[in-house]
Design a protein with these regions (language model features):
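N-terminal helix-loop segment corresponding to the beta1-alpha1 unit
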Residues: 1-191, 217-218, 362, 368-396
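Glycine-rich beta-alpha junction loops
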Residues: 44, 128-130, 202-207, 238-240, ...
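Aromatic-enriched alpha-helical interface/lid elements that frame and gate functional surfaces
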Residues: 87, 230-305, 309
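A short glycine-threonine-serine/GTX helix/turn-capping micro-motif
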Residues: 163-173, 197, 225-231, 240-242, ...
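Substrate-binding/catalytic subdomain of NAD(P)-dependent oxidoreductase enzymes
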Residues: 185-218
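A glycine-rich dinucleotide-binding beta-alpha-beta segment and adjacent secondary-structure elements
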Residues: 304-357
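C-terminal active-site "lid" helix and adjoining low-complexity regulatory extension at the edge
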Residues: 341-379
């Protein structure tokens, strides 16, 4: 599907010096909406290239969060490499970095220095703990953010121990908030003509994302919040199903379906607040009924009653469901290194089949091309390659 619309961020130049997931995911969204994003990496590459199973110099995480970018590999520790970095940031609309506080300053690439030659730059600096406080210089990964902010207490296992959510949730959330902040700063610049420093950190993003739970924790003294009953996951004879029958009419319908009409009049369950107070007993009774039949049966019958429900799906269930295909949740792309892979459609964005928006670059894949675009001669580029200031993919 292609709407033929002009990408809204076309013409914007982005210097993406970030690594990992948070910064790259922000830059990834800018690229998907048409910005010219240059992925700037040191000779060793973004560390996420090595995270998980590797496909040459690529890994699934790198591919997912760096689609649509071009790659430039430069060594800031060389005179030539640093000069290249300074030239590019002076001509960039947006700069994104995710080093610990002070690192970019040591190279003269911090906001205060950059804005002297590029006053309209939007500079997004992403860190773990922020630029203040006793933890400002501590290294952070997603699991640290999940642990420090209390997020893991929302995911206790049967052992009662808080566990990490099995993906880089805090990183992705930080990237989304960073993209939001950059987008509003772009509008501000269009209206007022001024640049902006955006200081983003993972703990702040996590707190914002969990805002409701944090308020509930304080007001309810740590007690678990039950929004209504019956809701949640119930066992079936071939898996489990999730349903919500909180409203009185839905509870009535569910009681009839599981052939337990007496529950409606049971003094433990005949009012909203009573169902919440006795949620464990109610859940156990409903589970005794749901475990006798299959997911397919319950889905069909609950749908008839317009009761919110969904079987607990695997990734394969989701990927190959007819709804997933019909609504373009996923694009299947033939990647040159990974083969046929599923790529999630950006919400609100037109699906794509292949091309630059689906391509995640190899380390230094576009180095020579980018340097040429920024005014460097062939002789200068050759010298950069010889001195190790620049690395071009495919050249030794």
């Amino acid at each position: 599907m292609d709407t033929g619309e002009e990408p809204p961020l076309e013409g914007l130049n982005v210097f993406d010096a970030s690594q990992g997931v948070a910064g790259p995911s922000c830059a990834f969204l800018l690229a998907q909406y048409g910005a010219n994003v240059i992925k700037v990496e040191p000779p060793r590459g973004d560390w996420v290239r090595q995270a998980g199973k590797k496909y040459g110099d690529l890994a699934a995480g790198y591919v997912n969060f760096n689609r649509g970018k071009r790659a430039l590999c430069i060594n800031f520790k060389t005179k030539g490499g640093l000069a290249i970095g300074k030239r590019l940031v002076s001509q960039s609309d947006i700069v994104i970095e995710s080093f610990r506080p002070g690192v970019m300053g040591r190279f003269g690439l911090d906001y205060e220095t950059v804005k002297k030659t590029n006053p309209k730059v939007i500079y997004c600096s992403i860190s773990g703990f922020g630029t203040k406080g006793p933890n400002r210089d501590k290294p952070v990964t997603d699991v640290v953010a999940q642990s420090f902010t209390g997020w893991m207490t929302l995911n206790k296992g049967n052992d009662g121990i808080p566990h990490k959510v099995g993906m880089t949730a805090m990183d992705v959330i930080t990237g989304l908030y960073a993209y939001q902040a950059v987008a509003t700063a772009l509008y501000r610049r269009a209206v007022k003509g001024s640049g902006k420093l955006i200081e983003m950190n993972m703990m702040q993003a996590a707190a914002a994302f969990m805002g409701q739970k944090i308020i509930e924790h304080v007001k309810q003294e740590g007690k678990i919040t039950v929004l209504g009953a019956p809701t949640g996951t119930f066992p079936t004879n071939d898996g489990s199903i999730n349903l919500s029958a909180r409203e009185p009419d839905k509870f009535h319908a569910l009681c009839q379906l599981i052939e337990k009409p007496e529950l409606e009049h049971d003094p433990r369950f005949n009012e909203w607040d009573k169902r919440i107070a006795n949620v464990d007993e109610l859940t156990a009774i409903i589970s005794e009924a749901t475990i006798t039949k299959s997911n397919a049966y319950w889905t069909k019958e609950l749908d008839k009653l317009d009761i919110i429900n969904s079987p607990t799906a695997t990734f394969d269930d989701f990927l190959y469901h007819p709804q997933t295909k019909a609504a373009d949740y996923i694009n299947w792309v033939n990647h040159e290194s990974l083969g046929n892979i599923p790529m999630a459609t950006i919400p609100g964005h037109s699906p794509f089949a292949d091309g630059i928006l689906a391509h995640a670059p190899h380390l230094g894949e576009h180095s020579e091309q980018i340097l040429s675009e920024y005014g460097y001669s062939l002789k200068e580029i050759e010298d950069f390659l010889k001195t190790g200031s620049v690395v071009q993919y495919g050249e030794t």
